[in-house]
Amino acid sequence: MTGAKRKKRSVLWGKMHTPHREDIKQWCKRRLPILEWAPQYNLKENLLPDTVSGIMLAVQQVAQGLSFAMLSSVHPVFGLYGSLFPAIIYAIFGMGRHVATGTFALTSLISANAVERLVPQSSRNLTTQSNSSVLGLSEFELQRIGVAAAVSFLGGVIQLVMFVLQLGSATFLLTEPVISAMTTGAATHVVTSQVKYLLGIKMPYISGPLGFFYIYAYVFENIKSVQLEALLFSLLSIIVLVLVKELNEQFKRKIKVVLPVDLVLIIAASFACYCTNMENTYGLEVVGHIPNGIPPPRAPPMNILSAVLTEAFGVALVGYVASLALAQGSAKKFKYSVDDNQEFLAHGLSNVIPSFLFCIPSAAAMGRTAGLYSTGAKTQVACLISCIFVLIVIYAIGPLLYWLPMCVLASIIVVGLKGMLIQFRDLKKYWNVDKIDWGIWISTYIFTICFAANVGLLFGVICTIAIVLGRFPRAKTLSITDMKEMELKVKTEMHDETSQQIKIISINNPLVFLNAKKFSADLMKIILKESDSNQPLDDVSKCEQNTLLSSLSNGNCNEEASQPCSSEKCSLVLNCSGLTFFDYTGVSTLVELYLDCKSRSVDVFLANCTASLIKAMTYYGDLDTEKPIFFDSVPAAISIIQSNKNLSKASDHSEV
């Protein structure tokens, strides 16, 4: 009898722990998102816009690949490889449909620190005479790409470790002001690093703490050595790039295909330099020989991993943060979701695997992602199509870029960072919404330009956490027990009864970046129907212990509170008396929820708001100004809801 029970128990245990086919299928779809969207791909509707976007993206990938390879202190051809392989891997594992992975200015700048430290220019004379069998490049160039590949490999390993540890859930610590300040500061660093090419000045590599200021000090000390030809070429290139891109932006709705000004400029500059022999006549620095083809894979030098650990952490964190911000932005814009942890896996593999193929560190770039938006890309097929054209450049067109001036590439880098640099304009909205966030932005930016992007990011996160922890103890929490979530029978003027549901929800905590995502999720759980009506909402039923929201039924969250609002006859009253303070992320979440509810025909009213909250929400969002949404009390809001219903019924009756 005991043996039979034991056997039965072992059979049940085996069934519980044997993975089912459906579970394996779901796991594969979760870890390989391409298996989810590729079978559903609509060739008729999506192939044409994806093809056009892919061609335009290829132009950007080639131009930025050459530019960011130079920024990373390696041969330009390795930037072309970095524009090819990471894009393919991200298309398989990534969830951002409009995220264009490839070479990236910030990660290139970070890896350049390791390259210049371990393989400085002073060692060039020792290796320049000995050419390797790899693409005919010198041992010096191969040593440099070896260091950059090692940074990419170790950075990708760090991202994969973060994926295994499920650290994607910790990304809520990365607030919008911190990310904005860090990327703006890093973009300022990148522009500074290109000054020597823009001015044609020969200068040593300068990095480290306060290196930003040392570079400009060196430039001013050697201002007389500025090369006039390079300066004029740079000014002309920047003017053309800015002017044409602004015109493309202004008329993008009227023209089907924007002018690929980067490609046109590269061709025109190379042709002009070739015809006038500027390299020999004026000493203008050009890209030089670009070999065609792809070399066989080679492992990065593992013996230097400990020496590049600092840069690898910088690449892992900065690259992931910048890429995740773009993925979340595209997801919000086009109404789909992105798994923060899956992005760790996608970007980790996009760095580890290409490191064996002579690639520099990769990440998503704002300019390329914005290009996919503007050209109407639908899926990652656009990125895969761009890889085909990048491959053509690698095998056929690359050698023709010999005469491309370095100052033109530097101009492309600088103009390509415009989207990051104009984030200075965010300071005004931070000042109007939350002055503490304004202070965090300024301090994070200063730390970034004084030290490095990863240092600035770390400072911003620590500073933000410290401020929130300092504010939370002073926060007042409100628990109202005498209000109920009610089904009201509203009698209209025509003595007709219409059932209207009014949900009264109290916000019981400050609304800041730490809890904004949870607030949004809990509120939407109350509003939206669940696919399984019999499944209780655990998070809502436990809201008294661990959530921001209290759906008020004698102070308790019950299953009734989880019933969805009717899409036509539902009003939501948010009691904000417990919202004692907020930050920019909290305000943006509140406004976005309001607009989302409005699009679902759910009327939202806010009661007991502080003057600062009303001012911040009015400044931030395009709120409905035709009817009031802010009220002094909950009864006042309910009174308006009843009045609006009576007026609506009276109007309907008069029309009949």
From Swiss-Prot:
It is a multi-pass membrane protein. GO terms for molecular function: bicarbonate transmembrane transporter activity; chloride channel activity; chloride:bicarbonate antiporter activity; monoatomic anion channel activity; oxalate transmembrane transporter activity; sulfate transmembrane transporter activity. Expressed in the Reissner's membrane epithelial cells in the cochlea (at protein level). Expressed in the retinal pigment epithelium (at protein level). Abundantly expressed in parietal cells on the glandular portion of the stomach. Lower levels are observed in the kidney, with expression in the proximal tubule and thick ascending limb of the loop of Henle. Also expressed in distal segments of nephron, in extraglomerular mesagial cells and a subpopulation of intercalated cells of outer medullary collecting ducts. Expressed in the thyroid gland. Regulated by pH. Activity inhibited by all inhibitors of several anion channels and transporters, including 4,4'-Di-isothiocyanatostilbene-2,2'-disulfonic acid (DIDS), diphenylamine-2-carboxylic acid, glybenclamide and 5-Nitro-2-(3-phenylpropyl-amino)benzoic acid. It catalyses: chloride(in) = chloride(out); iodide(out) = iodide(in); bromide(in) = bromide(out); oxalate(in) = oxalate(out). Keywords: Anion exchange, Cell membrane, Endosome, Ion transport, Membrane, Transmembrane, Transmembrane helix, Transport. The keyword Ion transport applies. Its main location: membrane. The chain crosses the membrane at residues 76-96, 145-165, 167-187, 200-220, 223-243, 255-275, 307-327, 344-364, 384-404, 405-425, 449-469. Residues 1-75, 166, 221-222, 276-306, 365-383, 470-656 are cytoplasmic. GO terms for cellular component: apical plasma membrane; basolateral plasma membrane; lateral plasma membrane; membrane; recycling endosome membrane. It comes from the Eukaryota. Residues 641-656 are annotated as: Membrane targeting. Residues 97-144, 188-199, 244-254, 328-343, 426-448 are extracellular. It holds the Pfam family STAS. PANTHER family: SULFATE TRANSPORTER. This is Anion exchange transporter. It comes from Mus musculus. The gene is Slc26a7.
